[in-house]
């Protein structure tokens, strides 16, 4: 019988059997005098009991004493152990487990994890890097980055793939996790309620918890829709507000940029489903392939014989055989200075840029543009790029730190453009198009 697999990502710990997910639970714990609330129930009371709530015991897996004394747990390792016991029970008590873990885990944390498992009623038979396992299921030869988001940070894993998938580097972006995304959303939504219904949901713990409980639904809705209706009940009163997609993307822009700016331009991106579920993020990357939640488990199932080992000191696997039937292939990438476009040898000179159905003429004097706002003044601190036209043709120059894209490829400072090319921005669905206007 195939082993069960536990993916340790505290934004949603997942358990799979034979490649199919059977359990999902977040890495939250609320300490009570005589019990510990874990998982989703703990997450849904985190803002009701903030001092008793813990959500960093997986990311900071250690034996340092908890800040709040409790007879139920002494340190983060105790909380992790208690959650593993609960997961084992909820997942029909598997005898053997393979763990997939993020590249952010240190040797000491991996050793501590295996020590914790020795006190659990199951046996750990494998330990593998989550990014490596996911890529081994789908990716063909090339250079990739695997990007995944946890509760409090994002992990970018560099992978080289030939006959094998090999981890070559790990970059951790702190303070850029699901909780940071939700905190940003909560602040924006609270402001909207104050503006639209004179109600502040963050003034009381119960309504603040209700706000946070609904944020995942709001984000899913805005993946495909331009707006979402917000509602929070307080007593017998139903408070409502409306959230539009574009202001949300602007609010999340700084979080998105932390990740985008850390991605090497020459790499193909393998994007976890957690990031794919954030509105506008997938459009921020020029060469990206979304991964399903099951992908990492399929990689483990395909390579279980390689991953499995015996004894208390398991080998941490950071290289696996590459799939012979890849669903993802690296794509030829144009240099940032000259993004690829179709029929570039026949492309007409761009004379105008089409913004919100209005054509703006290009000339020697730069035209300054901002995502979602269109043409702005040269002195506008929020300008994102400038466009100008010379004898050599039209070109786009980045202004400020926001990543700018031409035809889906991020530019490096400046790039030429022709009629038919598109202009985009990190963290925004805004797309402007260059056109050639014929004069007679």
Model region roles, listed by residue range:
Residues 7-10, 101-104, 148-150, 271-276, ...:
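Structural motif
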Residues 221-336, 345, 363-366, 371-373, ...:
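Helical "lid/coupling" subdomains associated with nucleotide-phosphate turnover
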Residues 99, 108-195, 254, 273-275, ...:
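Small-residue (GG/TT-enriched) beta-loop-alpha framework at ligand/catalytic clefts
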Residues 160-243, 273-276:
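Phosphate-binding glycine-rich/basic clefts of nucleotide- and phosphate-handling proteins
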Residues 11-100, 230:
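Conserved phosphate-binding loops in N-terminal lobes of ATP-dependent enzymes
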Residues 93-104, 202, 261-276:
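Short glycine-rich phosphate-binding loop at a beta-alpha junction
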Residues 351-440:
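Forkhead-associated
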Residues 1-25, 29-32, 138-168, 185, ...:
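Gly/Thr-rich phosphate-binding beta-strand-loop-beta motif of the actin/hexokinase/Hsp70
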């Amino acid at each position: 019988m195939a082993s069960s697999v536990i993916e340790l990502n505290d934004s949603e710990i997942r358990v799979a059997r034979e490649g199919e997910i059977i359990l999902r639970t977040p890495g939250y714990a609320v300490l009570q005098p005589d019990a510990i609330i874990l998982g989703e129930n703990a997450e849904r009371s985190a803002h009701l009991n903030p001092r008793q709530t813990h959500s960093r015991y997986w990311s900071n897996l250690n034996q340092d004493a908890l800040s709040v004394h409790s007879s139920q747990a002494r340190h983060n390792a105790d909380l992790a152990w208690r959650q593993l016991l609960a997961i084992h029970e909820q997942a029909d008590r598997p005898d053997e487990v393979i763990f997939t873990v993020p590249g952010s885990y240190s040797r000491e944390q991996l050793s501590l994890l295996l020590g914790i498992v020795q006190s659990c009623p199951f046996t750990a038979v494998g330990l593998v890097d989550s990014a490596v396992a996911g890529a081994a299921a789908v990716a063909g030869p090339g250079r990739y980055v695997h990007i995944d988001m946890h509760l409090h940070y994002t992990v970018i894993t560099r992978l080289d793939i030939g006959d094998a998938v090999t981890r070559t580097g790990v970059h951790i972006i702190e303070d850029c996790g699901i909780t940071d995304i939700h905190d940003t959303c909560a602040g924006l939504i609270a402001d909207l309620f104050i503006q639209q219904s004179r109600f502040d949901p963050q003034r009381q713990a119960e309504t603040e918890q209700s706000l946070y409980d609904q944020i995942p639904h709001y984000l899913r809705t805005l993946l495909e829709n331009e707006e979402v209706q917000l509602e929070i009940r307080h007593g017998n009163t139903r408070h409502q507000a409306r959230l539009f997609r574009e202001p949300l993307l602007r609010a999340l822009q700084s979080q998105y940029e932390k990740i985008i700016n850390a991605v090497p331009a020459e790499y193909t991106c393998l994007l976890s489903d957690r990031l794919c579920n954030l509105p506008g993020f997938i459009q921020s990357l020029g060469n990206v392939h979304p991964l399903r939640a099951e992908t990492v488990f399929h990689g483990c199932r395909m390579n279980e014989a390689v991953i499995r080992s015996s004894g208390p000191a398991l080998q941490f696997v950071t290289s696996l055989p590459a799939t012979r039937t890849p669903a993802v292939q690296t794509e030829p990438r144009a240099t940032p200075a000259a993004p690829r476009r179709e029929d570039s040898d026949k492309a007409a000179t761009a004379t105008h840029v089409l913004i919100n159905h209005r054509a703006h003429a290009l000339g020697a004097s730069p035209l300054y543009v901002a995502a979602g706002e269109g043409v702005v003044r040269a002195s506008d601190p929020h300008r994102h790029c400038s466009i100008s036209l010379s004898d050599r043709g039209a070109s786009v120059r980045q202004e400020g730190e926001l990543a700018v894209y031409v035809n889906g490829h991020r530019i490096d400072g400046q790039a030429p453009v022709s009629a038919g090319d598109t202009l985009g921005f990190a963290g925004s669905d805004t797309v402007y198009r260059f056109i050639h206007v014929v004069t007679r």
